[in-house]
C-alpha cells in the first residue's frame, strides 16, 4: 500500500510542478533533488532485491557499498550497467519534464505543494523506511528486552544417548517443497520431510540471512551482528567468545563434533566459528582433496554435493562403528545462487518451469536427491535407532533464476527432524525462526530448551510468537548482540606476529591484512574478505580526520608514503590521517611491537584528495620503479604502458589467464632495444609443461619450454622493426579452480610468471 502511495505522490509532484509551478531555479533544483532521491532510493531497493532477494538489509548495504566480488559476479554486471543507464535516463527525463513550462511565471503555492508531495513520496517509500530502520539500529544503545529473553543454557546434557546428524542445505528453503507450486521438484527429500517433525513456519530474521549468519543463529540462538561485516569473519581469531552454543554443549557432554563441507572452511570464518564452539574435526575443500575419489571434480565453490555427502557417510559409518558419541554437521553448496550446480550422479539433471529449463530448480532437484540418498543410507543402517537427523536451510534463497517464482509463495526456511529412537510424523505450524533450531535440537537430545534468544519449538515460545514486530525487535537488540563480542574500545599498543600473519591488541586477535578506524571509545575493524573491497579502497572512503591503522603488504601503501618499499611483500604498518600526517613502518621482526601515535594536525585538503585518488588507482594501473616486471606485486614497471591476459598477483607471482586474453601481452611505452635478452622466470601449468610456448616480439618468434617448477630461461631477440610489445602464447590453457578465489568462475591457466626482465645487449 505504501509503495502505491509513494508512487502516486511522486507522479502528483511531477505533474503539479511541470504544469503549474512555472520558472524558478531554486524551486526547480529543490524539487528535482527530492524527486531524484525518490528515484535513487527505489532503484537501490530494486538492486538490493536483485542481488539478495531481501530488500535493503545489513548485508546488502555492505555489498552495494563495496566491490561486488565473489560468487557469480559476472552474472550481475549487465543488470548493474542497466540500472546505471536507467538512472541517467530517468534523471534526464525528469529534468526535461519539470522544465516544460519554464517560460511561465513562477507560482510559489504550486511549487511548495509539489515539493511537499515529493517529500511525502520519499517518506512513504518502502526503501526509505528500510534504510531508516537500519540507521536506527546502528544508533540505538540496545533494547531492555534483550536481558529478559537472552538465556544461557546449561553447559552439558545429562546422560546423552543420541548421536546427531545436522544437514545444512544451501539456500534450500521450504518453499521449494510446495508440490502445488513446483510439481515433483523435491520428491525424495520431500517424502522424508513428511515422515518426520516438519516445522512449517520458520521465518528469516535480520542477521540470519547468509550462510555463516544462519549457522550462528541455528547454533548460538543469536543473529550474526558484529562490529564488522559478517562475511569478513575470517579475519577474527575467536567468534562470539562469551557465548555458549550447541557445539560447546555437545563437546562438554562427551560428543566428538565433526563438520564436512565442499567449500574452503576459511570463507566467512566458518573455521573460526566452529573451532571457537566445540568442533575439533573440520573438513573442507583443502582437507578433502587428498581423500576424495576425484580431486578434479569440483564446481566454483568446491566439491559437489554428491562427493561431500559420500564423505559424510563414510564419517558417519566410521564414527558409529567406534561407539563414540558424536555429532556430524554437513553443508551442501550445489544450490548456491545465482544458478547452482548439477552433480554428475543425479538421476534428474533438468527441471523445466514455465516450459523451459531452469538451472536453479534443476540444482535444487539434484541436490535434494543427494541429501535424500545420504539420509536413506543412515536410515537403513543399524545405527539409525541411536541417531537424530536434522535437515535445515541455512537461509532463504538469494536472487537466483528461480527467485521470482519463489517470491510468489509464502516463503519459509526448511527445518525438519527425523528421530531414529522415536519416530514422529507431524507438521508443526508454530511461528518460529532460525534461532530456535539449536534449542529445539538440544531439547530433543535431553538438554535445556533454550539457547540465547532461541527457544525449543517443542516446549518453548519463540520470539516470533512473542513479538508481532519481531524483525524490528531483533534490530533493536543489535547493539546488545554486538557487545557479546567483547570487542576492545581502544588501541594503544599492538603486536604484529609476522609468521602467523596476526595482529593482537587489547586482548583481541585478527588475521592480516587489517584496517582499523580509531575514534574515541571505538575501534572499528575493517578486514579484507572475498566480498569486500581491497583495504586501500576502503581507506579511501575515510574522512580527512579519521584516525587509521593499516597493516598490509608494504607495496600496497608504498606508492603513497614509502617508495623505497614499492617491491616489498613484507608486512608494513601505516597510521595517521588521510588529510594529515601518515607514517609507514616495516615489520622487521617475528614479534613486532608498535604503538598508536595520532597527532593533532592541520588538515590539508589537497593532500587528502591526492591520497584518496592514489588509493583508488586500480591494480593494473599502478606503476613502480624497477628494471624488471615483478609479478607478485600489483601493477607494472614505469616502462610498461599496459598489459593483458594476466591474472591477479599471488604470493609467488601471477598466472596467465586465457579468460582475460588468449595471449599474455605486455606493451611498453618505448620500442624495445634492437637487440636484447629476455630473461623469464616462470613455470607451466598442466599440459603446458614441457611444450614449446611461443614468445613473440614484432616479427621474431622464439620458443620457451617450462616445467611444473619455477625456472629461469633467457631468450635472445633481434628487434629491427622497433616493436614495443611482448607476446607469450601458452599452447594449452587449462580451465581450473586451482588457487582461485572462492566462488569465482574457473580461470584458464597457462604459465605462472615470477619475473620478466629485458636486458639491452646492443653493442
From Swiss-Prot:
Transfers a phosphoglycerol residue from phosphatidylglycerol to the membrane-bound nascent glucan backbones. Keywords: Cell inner membrane, Cell membrane, Membrane, Transferase, Transmembrane, Transmembrane helix. Its EC number is 2.7.8.20. Pathway: Glycan metabolism; osmoregulated periplasmic glucan (OPG) biosynthesis. SUPFAM superfamilies: Alkaline phosphatase-like. One of its GO terms (biological process) is glucan biosynthetic process. CDD domains: LTA_synthase (cd16015). NCBIfam families: PRK03776.1 (NF003000). GO terms for cellular component: plasma membrane. It comes from Salmonella paratyphi B (strain ATCC BAA-1250 / SPB7). This is Phosphoglycerol transferase I. Its main location: membrane. InterPro entries: Alkaline_phosphatase_core_sf (IPR017850), DUF7024 (IPR054288), OpgB (IPR020881), OpgB/LTA_synthase_biosynth (IPR050448), Sulfatase_N (IPR000917). It is a multi-pass membrane protein. Coiled coil: none annotated. The chain crosses the membrane at residues 1-21, 26-46, 77-97, 108-128. It catalyses: a phosphatidylglycerol + a membrane-derived-oligosaccharide D-glucose = a 1,2-diacyl-sn-glycerol + a membrane-derived-oligosaccharide 6-(glycerophospho)-D-glucose. Signal peptide: none annotated. Belongs to the OpgB family. PANTHER family: LIPOTEICHOIC ACID SYNTHASE, PHOSPHOGLYCEROL TRANSFERASE I. One of its GO terms (molecular function) is phosphatidylglycerol-membrane-oligosaccharide glycerophosphotransferase activity. It is found in: Cell inner membrane.
Amino acid at each position: 500500500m505504501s509503495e502505491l502511495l509513494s508512487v502516486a505522490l511522486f507522479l502528483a509532484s511531477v505533474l503539479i510542478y511541470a504544469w503549474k509551478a512555472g520558472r524558478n531555479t531554486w524551486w526547480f533544483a529543490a524539487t528535482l533533488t527530492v524527486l531524484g532521491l525518490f528515484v535513487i532510493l527505489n532503484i537501490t531497493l530494486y538492486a538490493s532485491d536483485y542481488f539478495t532477494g531481501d530488500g535493503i538489509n545489513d548485508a546488502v548495504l555492505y555489498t552495494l557499498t563495496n566491490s561486488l566480488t565473489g560468487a557469480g559476479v559476472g552474472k550481475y554486471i549487465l543488470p548493474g550497467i542497466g540500472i546505471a543507464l536507467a538512472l541517467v535516463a530517468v534523471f534526464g527525463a525528469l529534468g526535461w519534464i519539470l522544465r516544460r513550462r519554464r517560460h511561465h511565471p513562477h507560482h510559489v503555492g504550486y511549487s511548495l505543494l509539489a515539493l511537499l508531495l515529493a517529500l511525502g513520496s520519499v517518506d512513504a517509500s518502502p526503501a526509505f523506511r528500510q534504510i531508516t530502520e537500519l540507521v536506527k539500529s546502528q544508533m540505538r544503545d540496545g533494547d531492555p528486552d534483550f536481558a529478559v529473553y537472552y538465556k544461557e543454557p546449561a553447559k552439558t546434557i545429562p546422560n546423552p544417548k543420541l548421536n546427531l546428524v545436522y544437514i545444512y542445505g544451501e539456500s534450500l528453503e521450504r518453499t521449494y517443497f510446495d508440490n502445488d507450486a513446483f510439481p515433483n521438484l523435491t520428491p525424495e527429500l520431500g517424502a522424508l520431510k513428511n515422515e518426520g517433525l516438519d516445522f512449517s513456519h520458520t521465518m528469516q530474521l535480520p542477521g540470519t540471512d547468509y550462510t555463516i549468519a544462519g549457522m550462528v543463529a541455528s547454533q548460538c540462538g543469536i543473529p550474526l551482528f558484529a562490529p564488522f561485516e559478517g562475511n569478513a569473519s575470517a579475519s577474527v581469531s575467536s567468534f562470539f567468545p562469551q557465548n555458549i552454543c550447541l557445539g560447546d554443549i555437545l563437546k562438554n557432554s562427551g560428543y566428538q563434533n565433526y563438520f564436512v563441507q565442499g567449500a574452503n572452511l576459511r570463507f566467512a570464518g566458518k573455521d573460526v566459528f566452529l573451532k571457537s564452539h566445540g568442533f575439533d574435526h573440520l573438513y573442507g575443500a583443502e582437507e578433502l582433496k587428498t581423500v576424495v575419489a576425484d580431486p578434479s571434480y569440483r564446481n566454483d565453490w568446491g566439491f559437489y554435493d554428491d562427493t561431500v555427502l559420500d564423505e559424510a557417510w563414510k564419517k558417519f559409518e566410521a564414527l558409529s562403528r567406534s561407539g563414540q558419541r558424536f555429532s556430524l554437521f554437513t553443508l551442501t553448496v550445489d544450490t548456491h545462487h545465482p544458478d547452482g550446480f548439477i552433480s554428475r550422479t543425479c538421476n534428474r539433471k533438468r527441471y523445466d518451469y514455465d516450459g523451459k529449463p531452469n538451472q536453479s530448480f534443476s540444482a535444487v532437484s539434484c541436490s535434494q536427491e543427494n541429501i535424500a540418498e545420504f539420509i536413506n543410507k543412515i536410515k537403513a543402517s543399524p545405527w539409525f535407532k541411536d541417531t537424530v537427523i536434522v535437515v535445515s536451510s541455512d537461509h532463504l534463497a538469494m536472487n537466483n533464476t528461480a527467485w521470482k517464482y519463489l517470491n510468489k509463495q509464502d516463503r519459509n526456511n526448511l527445518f525438519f527432524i527425523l528421530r531414529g529412537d522415536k519416530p514422529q510424523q507431524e507438521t508443526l505450524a508454530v511461528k518460529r525462526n532460525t534461532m530456535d533450531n539449536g534449542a529445539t535440537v538440544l531439547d530433543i537430545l535431553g538438554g535445556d530448551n533454550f539457547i540465547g534468544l532461541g527457544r525449543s519449538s517443542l516446549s518453548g515460545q519463540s520470539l516470533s510468537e512473542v513479538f508481532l514486530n519481531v524483525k524490528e525487535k531483533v534490530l533493536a537488540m543489535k547493539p546488545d548482540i554486538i557487545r557479546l563480542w567483547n570487542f576492545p574500545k581502544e588501541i594503544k599498543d599492538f603486536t604484529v606476529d609476522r609468521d602467523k600473519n596476526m595482529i593482537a591488541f587489547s586482548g583481541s586477535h585478527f588475521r592480516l591484512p587489517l584496517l582499523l578506524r580509531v575514534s574515541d571509545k571505538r575501534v572499528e575493524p575493517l578486514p579484507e574478505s572475498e566480498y569486500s573491497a581491497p583495504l586501500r579502497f576502503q581507506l579511501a572512503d575515510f574522512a580527512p580526520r579519521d584516525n587509521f591503522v593499516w597493516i598490509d603488504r608494504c607495496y600496497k601503501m608504498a606508492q603513497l608514503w614509502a617508495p623505497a618499499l614499492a617491491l616489498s611483500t613484507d608486512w608494513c604498518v601505516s597510521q595517521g590521517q588521510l588529510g594529515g600526517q601518515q607514517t609507514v613502518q616495516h615489520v622487521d621482526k617475528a614479534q613486532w611491537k608498535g604503538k598508536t601515535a595520532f597527532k593533532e594536525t592541520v588538515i590539508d585538503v589537497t593532500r587528502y584528495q591526492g591520497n584518496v585518488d592514489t588509493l583508488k588507482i586500480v591494480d593494473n594501473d599502478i606503476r613502480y620503479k624497477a628494471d624488471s616486471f615483478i609479478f607478485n606485486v600489483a601493477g607494472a614497471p614505469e616502462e610498461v604502458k599496459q598489459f593483458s591476459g594476466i591474472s591477479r598477483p599471488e604470493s609467488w607471482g601471477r598466472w596467465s589467464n586465457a579468460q582475460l586474453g588468449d595471449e599474455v601481452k605486455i606493451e611498453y611505452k618505448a620500442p624495445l632495444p634492437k637487440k636484447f635478452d629476455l630473461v623469464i622466470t616462470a613455470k607451466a601449468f598442466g599440459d603446458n609443461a614441457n611444450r614449446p610456448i611461443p614468445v613473440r616480439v614484432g616479427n621474431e618468434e622464439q620458443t620457451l619450454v617450462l616445467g611444473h617448477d619455477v625456472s629461469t630461461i633467457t631468450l635472445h631477440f633481434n628487434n629491427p622493426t622497433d616493436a614495443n610489445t611482448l607476446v607469450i602464447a601458452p599452447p594449452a590453457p587449462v580451465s581450473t579452480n586451482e588457487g582461485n578465489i572462492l566462488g569465482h568462475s574457473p580461470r584458464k591457466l597457462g604459465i605462472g610468471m615470477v619475473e620478466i626482465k629485458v636486458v639491452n645487449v646492443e653493442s
